[in-house]
Amino acid sequence: MITMPDYRPGMNGIIIGLLSSFGSAILIGCFFLIFYFFRCTTSGRIFLDRIGRPGEYDDEQQFLREEAEALETMDDMQRTEYLRAKAFIAANPPESLQTDISLSQYLAIQEKGVSAWEFEPELEIANCFVEARTEIEFFDSECTVMSNLPVPKQNEVYYWEAKIYDKPENTLISIGMATKPYPLFRLPGFHKYSVAYLSNGTRRYNQPFNATSYGPQVVQGDVIGVGYRPRSGTIFFTRNGKKLEDVVHGLKSQNFFPSIGANGPCIVHVNFGQAGFVFIEANVKKWGLAPMTGSLAPPPPYGSEQGSILLEAGTKDGFTSTLGRGRGYSHPVQTYSRQGLAAVDSSHNRTRSGNFRMFPPTSPGPVRSPTDISLAHLVPTEDAGEPSSSAAALVDQDGQPITGGFLSPDQPPPEYTSPVNSRPGSRRHSSDSENTPLIQLSGRSRGASSATARPIQSGGSHNRPRAGSHRPPSPPIPSYQDAVRQGAGRDRSDSTRSARDSS
């Protein structure tokens, strides 16, 4: 009788399970090997990193192949411009300049806020004009303008917008960011390292040959936004407040500058954050390049403090006045010629009007008179030029001075009467009084009166009599005709004395 060996069903199950597991793993591995073999051997590309991006050497080889194909299709002008840009990049490699924000630039940003950013056109190209820091006007040839400061990297996202104010149909506009140095005679996005959204609806990233379809075409009135995430190195675009897909990732180490270029006439206005964004999320999260206002305080308003001077000198009737400083306010000084006024006393100055008082101004600027008569000091000069209309009234046609006022002798002032008598030293003798007469009599009779004007003394508010003059307690005030007659008599006496001295 034949005996069968002992049958153990448990052991057989374990063996079958192990074989099936190893077989499945081997089968899956074979599929991966086949996929990897065909994926890596196609088009000669070699994967050198863990996420499937090609290596630098393979990128250069691919770029050289694209360059050779593109040069065959370019015309002479395009080929010349491309070779010129290639030579510029070879002489000035990207990021060869120190473009990090320096301490002085950081302090300027703290003081000015977003106003620290502005576009700087290249003077050698001179094919665009920048007005009010962020308003750019392009002309007839290809040109790019970049900002003076790079985009910071402290916050999570930085964002800015550009509005197309004027754009002809045949003008191509490129809006994006690039590193310095960059060939400014080329558009952004065409060379390394630069990213741009073009007005024909395409995008470019380090690509001078083939553009990639990206979004709608840009027309006049559209607003294109550019966003940058420093932590991930991501750059994205928006159009009229709607976010488009991300363009590039991994650009963390580069310092990007906002850049705008065009190949024809157009006008673009840029908003770095000095106004509200069309993209609502950027407004809510405050994605601007810097705060709207910095720590630099504005200047105080004029006139808020005592002694503020807005204008120290001016002109009236074609006459330029010189400046004489007073206490806390300006005081103009006028000059007149000595010709025809040799007999006039140098102290005969009209210093104020009868209905005008000199007070410190409550608002900045020179003190104005309610009359047309000049209230400025009359300073004699040898050649002061042509006098003003107010100064010319001091001399009549015969060259005789008018000591009683600024009017002519044939037209006396109306209702000129003497005030009532008062004690010496009273308020009527003060220069601040409104009733003080402009002409005082100095120890002469009414028939031979000598009218003398008293100038305002700078040392005090009261006028003092001359030494040697005897003032009666209540001197009479000469009439207008007496003052004119006395002035003519003084002229005759002076002429007689001068003739006697000459003989």
From Swiss-Prot:
It is a single-pass type II membrane protein. It comes from the Eukaryota. It is found in: Vacuole membrane; Endosome membrane. The keyword Ubl conjugation does not apply. The keyword rRNA-binding does not apply. Signal peptide: none annotated. The chain crosses the membrane at residues 14-34. Residues 35-503 are lumenal. Glycans are attached at N200, N210, N349. Gene3D superfamilies: 2.60.120.920. Residues 81-277 form the B30.2/SPRY domain. CDD domains: SPRY_SSH4_like. Residues 1-13 are cytoplasmic. Keywords: Endosome, Glycoprotein, Membrane, Protein transport, Signal-anchor, Transmembrane, Transmembrane helix, Transport, Vacuole. This is Protein ssh4. The lineage of its organism: Eukaryota, Fungi, Dikarya, Ascomycota, Pezizomycotina.
